[in-house]
Amino acid sequence: MRQRFTARAVVVGDRAGTVVPDAVVDVRDGVIEWVGPSSEAPEQGDADVVALPGVLTPGLVNAHSHAPMVLFRGQGEGLPLDRWLQEVMWPREARLTPEDVEVAMTAASAEMLGNGITTSVEMYFHPERIAAAVGVTGARAVIATPLLPLPGMPPMEEQLRTAVALAIGAPDDGSVEYGLGPHAAYTVPLPVLRDAAAAAREHGLLLHLHVAETATEGDDLLAAHGLSVPSLLAAHDVLGGRVLAAHCVHMDDGDLDLWQEYDVAVAHCPASNAKLASGVIRLRDMLDRGIRVGLGTDGPASNDSLDLLADQRLAAGMARLRERSATALTAAEAFWLATGAAADAIGRPDLGVLEAGRRADLVHVDTRDLVFEPVGDLADLLAHLVWSADGRHVRDVWVGGAQVVRDGASTRVDAGALRADVAARAARLATG
C-alpha cells in the first residue's frame, strides 16, 4: 500500500531541529520511502493522498513508563518516593489482577496515542497483558518484564527464567518487544541484577532499571557497599550491552564517566522527578558527554499525565534553570529528546525520525490555533511545538501507516467505556 502525506511542514525529529515547509512524506507498506518539500517530491502515482493542514511529526517515544498505573493516578499526593511506594502503591498493586492491568494499559495506551506517543517502554506486571492491550489500540511497546522480590511473586531466579523465555520467544515484527526490568539496585539482590544483565547481553535484550532516582537511594547503597549506585552496578557486571537507566538524578562526574564508558542510556522523567521532589538531572552534562538520553513520562501516578509534549517543555525549563542559561537546552534538542534521541536511547533505530527506511509512525499536530502564532520563520513552528503545544493539539496519529487516532479520538477503542471501567477497578483496589 502506498500513501502520500502532505502537510504545512514536517518536523523531522533530528537533533538539528530540521523543519521542512510545504512537505511530503511518502509511505509504502508502513515504512517511510521519501521525505522532503513538495516541489521535489517524486511522482504521486497510485498513492492514497492524506492532506493535512498542520505539522507532521514523528510518533513520540516514551522512554520510561508504568502506564497501567492510571489506576492510581493522583494517589499518595505529597509523599516522597519511599513512602509513596510503601504506603500507597505497593499495597494497591498487591491486589491487582491480570485483567486490571490489561484494561488499565488499554486505557493508558489510548491516552498516550491521543497525545502523540506511538511507542512506550513499559515496566509493569503481567507483561503479556500489556502486549495484548497495545495490540488492541495499535501502539508499539517495549516491555521490560519487572523483576522484583515482592510478596506473592515467584522466586527471583524463576522470574528471570520466565522473563527471558518470554523475550526470546516473541515475534520480531517491531510492534511488541520484551526486555528485562530488574527494578533497582535497592530492591533487587545484586546477584540477580548481574544474572539479568548477563542474560540481556546474551540475547540482545533491553535491560531497563531505575538508577539514582533519589538521594536516599544513593546514601543507603553508599553506606552498605561503599559505592555510588552506578559504581555498584559496574562492580557487579550489570553495565554493558543495551542498558536503559531511568531517572539518573543523583550522579557525580565519576558516575557520568561510567555511563559514557559503558554507553548507558538515560530515560529522563522531569515531571515525575519534580512531583516526587527527587531532584534535577545533569542533562546538559550528559548530552555534552555523548550520553544517550530520551524523555519518559514515568507512571501516571507520579507524573500524573502521559503527555510528552508537555514534558519536553518541563525538561527544557528545568535544564535552563539548573544551568542558569537560556541555551542549556534548545527547543530543537527538547523535541529531539522525545523523538529521535528517545528512539536511540531505547535501541530502536527504526523509530523516532521522519526519514526514509524508518517506520511510518506519524503525528499530525493541528497548528490552526493561537498558540502557533505568530510564525515568522520555520524555527518559530518548532519553538511553538515545544513551548506552547501539548497533547490537546494532536489531531491524528498513524502507526506503521495505519490510522489509530482520527480527529483526536481513538479509531480502535471506546475511551468512555474504558474510563468507567478504570474508575471502578481503581475504587476496588483503593479499598481492598
Label each PLM-derived region with a short phrase.
Residues R129-V249, G254:
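Metal-coordinating catalytic core of metallo-dependent amide/deamination hydrolases
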Residues R8, V25, G30, P53, ...:
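Divalent metal-coordination and catalytic microenvironments
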Residues M1-A23, R28-D29, A338-G432:
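Active-site microenvironment of metallo-dependent hydrolases
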Residues A235-R242, R284-V371:
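His/Asp/Glu-enriched, well-ordered alpha-helical/loop segment
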Residues L71-V103, T137-G152, E157, V164, ...:
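Active-site gating loops and adjacent loop-to-helix segments of metal-dependent hydrolytic enzymes
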Residues V55, R73-G138, R161-D172, A423-A427, ...:
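Alpha-helical scaffold segments that flank or form the walls of functional sites
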Residues A215-L227, D255-Q260, A277-M286, N303-R320, ...:
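Histidine/acidic-residue-rich catalytic or RNA/ligand-binding cores of hydrolases
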